[in-house]
Amino acid sequence: AYVEKPFSFNYLKTQIVSLLYNRQKEREAFSKRPFFPTNKMQMNKVDEEFMNKVIRTIEENIIDTNLNVEHLAEILGMSRSSLLRKIKMLSNLSPVDFIRLIRLRKSVELIHEGKYLIGDICFMVGINSPSYFSKLFLKQFGMTPKDFEKQSQADKEKIDMPS
């Protein structure tokens, strides 16, 4: 936000608080809403490119159940601590939680496609246990994968119905 001179300290403080609040809301939306796009988060160009590279790398290795912070840092050519610091700063999530979030968001896409069984999808996104997958999905999105699948199907049927 641009602030014209002269300005009062209270006005500046209010603007800063507002910007921080909006950024926090965007981070929450990114992690809680399955289809919230990455490019809607307020970041500078370099940070946006970095996050897109991280997401792309996770998606390219998503089936790998052993994908962890060390492996991701190695692929990206960064130290573990640098990766941790950068992801935490940009997403307000630890790298472990961020990897998990990208896995879950990919599962949402696959469920929405309607081509795969939920039991298969959990393995396709690198989670070995269907029950653990359901638990993570429920915690992240507030509904089970099965409920999301039903909702997604109902939404598709509404769209397909002639008016």
Predicted regions and their residues:
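C-terminal output helix
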Residues: 7-16
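Short, hydrophobic alpha-helical segments
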Residues: 16-24
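Basic, amphipathic alpha-helical hairpins
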Residues: 55-67, 87, 91, 108-117, ...
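Terminal helix-turn-helix DNA-binding modules in bacterial transcription factors
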Residues: 89-128, 150-163
